[in-house]
């Protein structure tokens, strides 16, 4: 499994060659490209969009325009589509149903793939229960999008869920359908249990860990120069190594 280290600090791209996962929103105020050392992937920033606005504020063309500009930084492997998350509090924000979120997710991918870009845009399965995800799979199928033939398919609405058993059942189901899944923000305990069934996953948990525990990396432990290491690449890399060795 490829593990992408989540980060909200753009210059981390120029300081490490480990695979990174970065939100499109972090690039919004950046006007020039970076000299990335390694490969990385782009999150759509959809959770923040829906949480803040109850809808997407970017059209498909605007999103692709931003993805194309971001792609001037080397190493971008893929970008997630503009999906519609299905956690209950997101559904409450939009006032729509899970089924409508799924329809909009499928329609978004269809529109994005008609636009001009060299970046691979990956589809995202959305839902909350296993039956929801099955329904989303069928929606893609009915629109002639065969998820089994896709190089990678995102599994959405899992990163803020604590019930690892539910997510494991969902991952197992689609793994047995030979779908190459990317788990967005999968919990560390989840990766231990079903990581081998994922093609890739990402996590920004190191930053929250540093902020709330107030632990420092080896570089800052003896002589802390910051309140915490929530933005510290050294802390992130040490956390990543610890997780990899568990």
Question: What function would you assign to each model-found segment?
Answer:
Residues 68-201:
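Eukaryote-skewed repeat-based solenoidal scaffolds used as protein-protein interaction platforms
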Residues 23, 32-33, 44, 129, ...:
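Generic serine detector
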Residues 1-108:
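Non-catalytic, usually N-terminal nucleic-acid engagement modules in DNA/RNA processing proteins
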Residues 1-15, 45, 68, 80, ...:
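Alpha/beta catalytic cores of nucleotide-metabolism and tRNA/nucleoside-modifying enzymes
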């Amino acid at each position: 499994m490829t593990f992408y280290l989540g980060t909200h600090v753009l210059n981390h791209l120029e300081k490490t060659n480990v695979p990174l996962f970065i939100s499109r929103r972090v690039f919004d105020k950046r006007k020039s490209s970076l000299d990335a050392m390694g490969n990385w992937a782009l999150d759509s920033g959809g959770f923040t969009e829906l949480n803040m606005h109850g809808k997407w504020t970017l059209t498909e063309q605007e999103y692709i325009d931003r993805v194309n500009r971001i792609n001037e930084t080397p190493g971008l492997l893929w970008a997630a589509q503009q999906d519609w998350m299905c956690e209950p509090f997101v559904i409450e924000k939009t006032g729509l149903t899970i089924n409508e979120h799924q329809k909009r997710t499928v329609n978004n991918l269809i529109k994005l793939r008609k636009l001009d870009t060299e970046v691979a845009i990956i589809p995202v399965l959305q839902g909350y229960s296993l039956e929801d995800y099955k329904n989303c799979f069928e929606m893609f199928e009915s629109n002639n999008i065969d998820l089994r033939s896709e190089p990678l398919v995102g599994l959405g609405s899992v990163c803020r869920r604590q019930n690892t058993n539910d997510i494991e059942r969902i991952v197992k189901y689609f793994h047995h359908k030979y779908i190459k899944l990317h788990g967005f923000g999968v919990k560390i305990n989840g990766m231990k249990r079903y990581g081998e069934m994922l093609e890739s996953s990402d996590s920004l948990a190191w930053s929250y860990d540093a902020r709330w525990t107030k632990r420092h990396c080896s570089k800052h432990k003896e002589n802390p120069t910051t309140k915490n290491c929530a933005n510290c690449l050294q802390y992130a890399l040490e956390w990543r190594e610890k997780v990899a060795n568990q």
